[in-house]
């Protein structure tokens, strides 16, 4: 009887030990999972001008970015600043963003097409203002594939001349597949961001974007996730 009791005690001890070990492992695994999921990146995109509102001057836009930097530093919030080409070529933004610590801030490309980029690429500007928010002018979709590549080359060359490296990320309300693939292959970007859905805003509509988290984009349409 004593042998049976001893045997049962050993089994019970092993069961309790394994249960505790498994519980500890599960907690560690859950903790690791939660840590992996806590990914937040603040993105501010910068345009030089805003022709839709007279009171939003170039100075107002610049001071807005200065304030954003102050707040992010105050609360120790890292993030990314995407520069539209007209802002990229402005010495105020160059000086401000070059001074940011690289371990907390990233500088990337904002892919809307303003007048200076088009003209520096050797093309005629068709917009109503130096930056036009309509899709046939303000986005790469308004240009031929060859023109899109030239626009990308001009932007990247000037970005590297100013910052000493090519941007690793790019953002836009909409990036076409040809442009994104070209910039990925030629300049080795590792990430991009886009708008998911909007109806009748800014002179165009988009629908059917992939919500929730990061994804590998489809080679047919960037707002859709790759099926494989």
Predicted regions and their residues:
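Bacterial Sec signal peptide processing site at the extreme N-terminus
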Residues: 22-30
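Bacterial N-terminal signal peptides that target proteins for export
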Residues: 1-8
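Hydrophobic faces of well-ordered beta-strands that scaffold small-molecule active sites
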Residues: 40-44, 79-81, 107-110, 168-170, ...
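Active-site beta->alpha N-cap acidic-glycine motif
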Residues: 29-103
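Active-site-adjacent pocket scaffolds in enzyme catalytic domains
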Residues: 168-228
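Metal-dependent polysaccharide deacetylase catalytic core of the NodB/CE4 family, i.e.
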Residues: 85-173, 228
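C-terminal motif of bacterial Sec signal peptides marking the signal peptidase cleavage site
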Residues: 18-19
């Amino acid at each position: 009887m004593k042998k049976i009791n001893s045997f049962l005690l050993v089994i019970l001890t092993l069961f309790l030990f394994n249960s505790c070990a498994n519980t500890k492992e599960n907690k560690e695994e859950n903790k690791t999972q939660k840590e992996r999921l806590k990914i937040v990146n603040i993105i501010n995109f910068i345009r030089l001008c805003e022709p839709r509102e007279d009171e939003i001057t170039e100075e107002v836009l610049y001071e807005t970015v200065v304030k954003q930097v102050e707040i992010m530093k105050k609360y120790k919030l890292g993030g990314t600043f995407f520069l539209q080409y007209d802002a990229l070529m402005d010495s105020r933004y160059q000086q401000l963003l070059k001074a940011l610590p690289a371990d907390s801030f990233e500088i990337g490309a904002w892919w809307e097409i303003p007048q200076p980029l088009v003209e520096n690429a050797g093309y005629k500007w068709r917009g109503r203002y130096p930056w036009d928010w309509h899709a046939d002018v303000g986005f790469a979709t308004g240009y031929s594939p060859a023109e899109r590549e030239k626009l990308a080359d001009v932007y990247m060359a000037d970005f590297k001349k100013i910052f000493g490296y090519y941007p690793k990320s790019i953002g836009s309300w909409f990036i076409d597949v040809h442009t994104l693939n070209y910039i990925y292959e030629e300049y080795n970007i590792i990430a991009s961001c886009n708008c998911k859905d909007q109806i009748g805003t800014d002179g165009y509509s988009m629908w059917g974007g992939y919500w929730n988290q990061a994804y590998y984009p489809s080679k047919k349409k960037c707002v859709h996730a790759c099926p494989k």
